[in-house]
Amino acid sequence: MPLLDSFTVDHTRMNAPAVRVAKTMSTPKGDTITVFDLRFCAPNKDILSERGIHTLEHLFAGFMRDHLNGEGVEIIDISPMGCRTGFYMSLIGEPAEKRVADAWLAAMEDVLNVVDQKAIPELNEYQCGTYEMHSLSQAQDIAKAVIAAGISVNRNDELKLSDEILHKL
C-alpha cells in the first residue's frame, strides 16, 4: 500500500491549533488544488469530542466558505479527521496560511454566535446520518479554545519524517 502524505510528517511535533499545507496538486486543466490540515488539537494529546466535532462539521463548512471563498479560492470540501484532532480542507487555489488562519478564526467567532442548536444546518434525519449526535455547547467550547490559543502554522519541512525513521516504522 502506498505511504500517504499525511503519514510522512511527525505528529509528535505538530503545533495546534495550526494550519498546514498538506498537499498541493495541479489538475490536467491547470487548476491548483490545495489540501490543508486544520489541526485543532495536538495529536495523541487531546481529541475533539464526538458531538462537538460533528456539530463543527455542520457549522464550520459553511462559515469557512463565507470567509475564504473568493479571490481565486473555492472550497471543495471540509471533513473531520478520523483521529478527531482536526479537519482536512480541500480547495481550488493557493491561499496563504495566514488567510486560512484568519478565515478559521472568523469561523470560530461565527460558531460562538449561533444561539440555538436548532440553528445548526442540516440537523435532521434526511440530511444527517446521526442527526441526534450533536452538541452546540461542545462545538462552542472548541471554538473558544481555538480563539484563546490562536492559530499557528505547521510547515512540512520542519515536520518531515526521515527515510530512516519511515523504514523503521
From Swiss-Prot:
Entries under SUPFAM superfamilies matching the protein: LuxS/MPP-like metallohydrolase
Cofactor binding notes: Binds 1 Fe cation per subunit.
Cofactor(s) named in the record: Fe cation
Highest taxon of the lineage: Bacteria
Catalytic activity: S-(5-deoxy-D-ribos-5-yl)-L-homocysteine = (S)-4,5-dihydroxypentane-2,3-dione + L-homocysteine
EC number, UniProt record: 4.4.1.21
The protein's enzyme class: lyase
Single GO term (MF): iron ion binding
GO biological process: quorum sensing
Residues holding Fe cation: 54, 58, 128
UniProt keywords, alphabetically: Autoinducer synthesis, Iron, Lyase, Metal-binding, Quorum sensing
Subunit structure: Homodimer.
NCBIfam families, per the entry: PRK02260.1-2 (NF002602)
Family: Belongs to the LuxS family.
Protein's job: Involved in the synthesis of autoinducer 2 (AI-2) which is secreted by bacteria and is used to communicate both the cell density and the metabolic potential of the environment. The regulation of gene expression in response to changes in cell density is called quorum sensing. Catalyzes the transformation of S-ribosylhomocysteine (RHC) to homocysteine (HC) and 4,5-dihydroxy-2,3-pentadione (DPD).
PANTHER family the record matches: S-RIBOSYLHOMOCYSTEINE LYASE
Listed name of the protein: S-ribosylhomocysteine lyase
Source organism per UniProt: Shewanella amazonensis (strain ATCC BAA-1098 / SB2B)
Gene: luxS
